[in-house]
């Protein structure tokens, strides 16, 4: 159902002004905006516009300078399929039962919930997927999404478009940046990693992917300008989840759910705006639907980013469930200062076996070696423990890297109680199943460590040529050891 867009345009203008994202007055005849939604795969806020010194991302920086940069933006899940399922529907993945990554049991969405592109298509938008880049959608449901084109150039005259594109360079198939290689000695590592040459080089290689992605994003934005579409197009740039490094993707720490969020809309969003509100990716869905003048059949879970309501938000929520064949479950609630994590399966290691991570994360191999050698610091060894604490609490102002669990401290107990209550309320509202008996039977929790010290050392050596390859040098990641994995049987740890 279409809303009266003329009234909505004026409403949005007023809300934007109250939100300090200034707008120029628009008449009731103002056309509905085009929407270009760009997703970076598997990377967080390690961009120069967010303060990272070693990386060079001029096109993304320019986008930030021409619009608004959000400093507290989050996904609802720390992995692509569940995060994208939420973004494609405007509803938390646990509410729509799309919360299991790489599930074999995909179903139709609950009654009344329909994909955002389909709603926009029905409202008269040309809905384009890919636009020359990745067409990844990766949803955990069977409904048709409603994309009607491959590029915004296929729209009819005067037809507004919604385009979703994915820049997949940052996914773990990393190339080297031949034009602007990053010196590993210039990067800043999180304190939960040991400072080793291989980890430094792995981190620098990741930052180079952002530089490569930046070049592609620059071409997309230039194409928008060349087509004369800049002024009436809302451009949104986000990450689909956090960085693909240990303690990042697949986990509810900041490294897994904190993402960049930049928006540009000339004449509506004031340039060089920085917003510290708590926002998540569902808010983008709500904003888009409102701007398009669409009334969804089921109320969306997000808030309009241009509303006063969002400034009053106290908490954001995130959840992690099955990752490939790895069974684990965690829930998190975050305020502006604190994060509370509830580990629903604390008896399982953070680093229980996961083929994807063991296959693609050189840093994880180093962590396993040093953990078994006993050479990690306490803040580094926490993530390698054989069990998790049932609860975690972090003061993000004092401890932005989340290395000091305050759950048993006396001072923040009122905060803990409030966060527990908020999380439980959210779980109830989402009809969150938590951990079922069937789910608990999955995975390989007893197989930890997943390999012997000798085996992990051999894997580090195999990763070495790939990680340290020179720009332009063609060396594939060492997949040959994965066939050996499954696993070191606990009775045969000497292998």
Regions found by a protein language model. Give the residues of each.
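Formylglycine-dependent sulfatase
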Residues: 2-391, 400-421, 428, 434-435, ...
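Extracellular, beta-strand-rich glycan-interacting domains
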Residues: 396-398
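A glycine-rich phosphate-binding loop feature that marks nucleotide/adenosyl-phosphate handling sites
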Residues: 439-444
